[in-house]
């Protein structure tokens, strides 16, 4: 795998995940209490022995850079690296990244300096565990110019994805972006060609692109340089290249979820608590998911009832009830609180007992969840200060609302409390 260079697409300004992306690049959004989105593709790369990795982001993020430099330091042991490349405006190119392919095009000069055979293009907002060695092996064995990782899907979900058709040898011959009706029916394929059983093939007669590609080095350069107006891999570069290049499909049979929207992100996080066995698990010693070591103390839970939840390290919980929730590092919950179906992202630092006491005396709200509060079906971003007797339950069942000046948004019926927000005592949302 020393001949493979990984390029992780960090996404644009992160509008689909806003307001979680208000103060950070999308790859830096916290996940499952103690990880960040970028940890998923990076861990997959490391477990697959791919150690030359670039991360492309639309704008630079202090928290992303800090996380990567503190977590993924390969110096002294190999020629591996993890480096962030942010969009930049130059005299030759005064524009920001116009799309996924344009992002790679703008930094092609940096990628071409490496002595490698293939580029592995990855997305930064997917939740899955994959050994890229099998994927790249398939690419080499078939002599493909480009190999796409695909997932089999059923008719119900098919119209939400870019679909493709393959011939009897697994070669991609046709594309359709989010087809409906008769056009959808025409995209059915025999997925037994890719290794599914007849029963599985009947259940999932469509194949969708995961947005993960392997390119031969010279093929990617050729496609990007000869087609400067094509800015997106999934919508333009890949469909355009099917005619003249050997495109192969590689079937991925594991769990895979695009978590690039608030609803999908929220549901994928809470699904980690599903019993008896969640579809994705962080408890896998063979293929671990790496993140920064923080050396935090164990969580302290005093007279609490906690069911179907994940609690990260360094939390202080007092006399509260927590159900089907994710608690991030350094979360603090005071007495008589109820937290249900909620993701609390925790805090970046602790407030000392004396500071908390002086804040209370001044009538200010300390960090964490105040006494007697109820939070249901919400995401509370880092360092939020929730006052006493606050109720966050989307009382009026609103689907979408922008209340940024009040410290929250409602997206798809999910209340999202902003990072560093303060919610006053007695507030009802």
Curated annotation (Swiss-Prot):
One annotated GO molecular function: structural constituent of carboxysome shell
Gene3D superfamilies, per database record: Hexapeptide repeat proteins, Spore Coat Polysaccharide Biosynthesis Protein SpsA, Chain A
EC number(s) on file: 2.7.7.27
Enzyme class: transferase
Entry's Gene Ontology BP terms: glycogen biosynthetic process
Keyword Electron transport: no
Record's catalysed reaction(s): alpha-D-glucose 1-phosphate + ATP + H(+) = ADP-alpha-D-glucose + diphosphate
Domain of life: Bacteria
Pfam families on file: LbH_GLGC, NTP_transferase
Record flagged with keyword Transferase: yes
Keywords: ATP-binding, Carbohydrate metabolism, Glycogen biosynthesis, Glycogen metabolism, Nucleotide-binding, Nucleotidyltransferase, Transferase
Annotated residues for binding of alpha-D-glucose 1-phosphate: 162, 177-178, 209
One GO CC term on file: carboxysome
Pathway terms, separated by semicolons: Glycan biosynthesis; glycogen biosynthesis
Protein family according to the UniProt entry: Belongs to the bacterial/plant glucose-1-phosphate adenylyltransferase family.
Role: Involved in the biosynthesis of ADP-glucose, a building block required for the elongation reactions to produce glycogen. Catalyzes the reaction between ATP and alpha-D-glucose 1-phosphate (G1P) to produce pyrophosphate and ADP-Glc.
Subunit structure: Homotetramer.
Stated name of the protein: Glucose-1-phosphate adenylyltransferase
Species: Rippkaea orientalis (strain PCC 8801 / RF-1) (Cyanothece sp. (strain PCC 8801))
Gene designation per UniProt: glgC
